[in-house]
Amino acid sequence: MRNYYLQYIEDTNINYFYLFLLHKIAVVDKSTRLYNTVKYSSLEELTNRLNIAYNNTNKDNEKQVISKTTLSRVLNSDKNGNYFNYDNVNKVITLKNNFTKRQTGGKAKFIILTDREIDFLLIHKSELLTRYYLYIKYYCGFSGKNETDFTANQFLEASKYSTKAGNYKTLLSSYNSLLVNEKLITISKFRFNGQERNKYSIL
């Protein structure tokens, strides 16, 4: 089983879907023992490889999920600089996933994801679901007890979503059911200041 190390920034505006595709095809760097290197011969070849990686994950729905134009835009976007380096001369992408204290001074926030988690998020292809799950996962780890509790508004505010749009809260409620059914999280109830709240744990 591969583990994926991902920097966690709550209000990032990166598109996680494309980042996860790059993680899926990365090969190991023997010096760090991390899957952080993507080499390619041309953007056409890399585009094809990313689409194959997605279709191998989502076998019931073969399609093109990224075009050469979109890939070029993703690779050249400054907003992705926290997550990978792109060298278009040597045709190599290096994922920034080395979070040892020596590299970061122990200050970087990061999450470790499994193949199963990455595949689940790729198949559902929802940025809101991805950000919601990463939020739960990060704060379960941060607590040191594998549990966290928060309100929908707390998550939405931290992730720069509108707290006034009722459809977001409806979606989050449906995501709770989905994540529980997929055995990725458990949810228990407790009362706080007279109100019932959810407590989340990662399985």
Where are these regions (language model features)?
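Short helix-coil-helix linker/hinge
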Residues: 9-17, 122-131, 135, 139, ...
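Winged helix-turn-helix DNA-binding recognition segment
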Residues: 26-93, 141-199
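Positively charged, structured surface patches that bind polyanionic biopolymers
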Residues: 1-16, 27-35, 98-124
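Generic detector of well-ordered alpha-helical segments enriched in charged/polar residues
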Residues: 6, 18, 72, 118-119, ...
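Cysteine-centered metal-binding/redox modules
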Residues: 21-23
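Short amphipathic alpha-helical segments that mediate assembly, nucleic-acid/protein binding
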Residues: 2, 14-18, 43, 68, ...
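Long, low-complexity, charge-rich intrinsically disordered regions
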Residues: 1-8, 105, 110-111, 183-203
